[in-house]
Swiss-Prot record:
Pfam families given in the database record: Late_protein_L1
UniProt-recorded name of the protein: Major capsid protein L1
Subunit structure: Self-assembles into homopentamers. The capsid has an icosahedral symmetry and consists of 72 capsomers, with each capsomer being a pentamer of L1. Interacts with the minor capsid protein L2; this interaction is necessary for viral genome encapsidation. Interacts with protein E2; this interaction enhances E2-dependent replication and transcription activation.
InterPro entries: Capsid_L1_Papillomavir, Capsid_L1_sf_Papillomavir, dsDNA_vir_gr_I_capsid
Subcellular location: Virion; Host nucleus
Organism the protein comes from: Human papillomavirus type 50
Amino acid sequence: MAHWSSTSGKLYLPPSTPVARVLSTDEYVKETDVYFHARSERLLIVGHPYYDIEDGGDIKVPKVSANQYRVFRCELPDPNKFALIDTTLYNSDTERLVWKLVGIEVGRGGPLGVGSTGHPLFNKVGDTENPSFYLGPQEKDERQNLSIDPKQTQLLIVGCKPAVGEYWDLAEPCDKNSLNNGKCPPIQLVNSYIQDGDMGDIGFGNANFPKLQQDRAGVPLDIVDSISLWPDLLKMTKDVYGDHVFFYAKQEQLYARHLFTHAGPIGEPIPNVSGVYNYAVNPNQPEQNRRTNIGSYLYFTTPSGSLNTSSSQLFNRPYWIRRAQGTNNCICWGNEVFVTVFDNTRNINFNISVKKDVNPLDPLNVASSYMYSKDDFNQYSRHTEEYELEFIFQLCKVGLDADILAHLNVMDPRILENWQLAYVPPAPSGIGDTYRYLKSDATKCPAKDSSAEVVDPYKEYTFWNVNLTEKFSSELDQYALGRKFLFQTGLLKRRVRTDYTVATVSKPNKRKRTR
């Protein structure tokens, strides 16, 4: 029987084949009661805070800024080949061992400090916050020497794959012929892995500044020729496998310290429609009225990180991971851990002065009768950073079931390759040919070796490699983070208490009644 419906939409039918379901690692990874502690050495880095110092094309002093990311790629030992593991703990024919991250502490050395960055030729004209007069026609060059204290950011991202960043870059227009010289190009959001040494956001946004600011005068020196990245947390937290971020901690802090405007012709001027955005200037006013040349609306703020205090520190404290945010509950596939750090709360730049006619290694040779002159000294700038990484890992087992192997093969085929599963090779189809004198000119060129080498998927990227293959220990009580873990989990032995001797009076035995 026909009936009337108020809406006529599409009819959605279920798929003909079942949709693949992403398994959580808790469904096929079995935990053990075996834990290990791992710790890196003290990791130090020194460089120039604003740019690389080059000599003949070679970098003599690298750029080391507090506004850079530090991405540590920690290499873990293969638990299936680990000598400290009891062979009776698992069956190598039906199981494989993996590491699970349960605790981490990122140590940072040095005092807190508020740094300064800027540009000696910054495109700034006038004060638009509290102006005392209206600016007249601009000169050809209005650039000033301006410095700021950058936005204060602390960021920690932990995963078994590199963190993904995002920034705004140039985009190809649909019609290149329609884009004339001097016109604003289209822009697009671009993703890339965050590498060690990449610049972060310091209050001017995440963008490709060398391409988007061709005047080289709109941002400080340390990002004027760099790409500022920001972690794409929306994308990483929605990843079906959750390998890029097990967990993250983030704290941002800033306020607008000054309000200025940029100089230069406006590419898209305010529409000249009286009564909409403004009213026309009265022509009967004196000719020297500066408002006949309307000012620039390219407003911008200079950020400030404000107060820096140790009570808001994300580092130098342990993090215990009970549940990751994704389906991967902190299983370190590939025996790797990526730790991404951004921390400019220790933004101290050392200013080093060296007298020109004195050995730099013997500065005390300056005579006490010397009369100061600034021209007698060379000034240098250096930035230093200090890190230490500590981990607590739990040993886990993965069964070599067919459905689990199929799931891992879809997720990352390199996992099965690293496990070196002994598949039965097919029977030979026939007799093969083997030549002697392979390097002879009379013999054909031999075929290349078919056995593929282990290819590093991140060989094109720059990370701070930390080798922890020989840093594991099962004696957790010998390390600070290990003792904290034992105390948190209740595995630490209780304090031995002495027995107290109490004087007691013996009671007389009661006589038994006799009938």
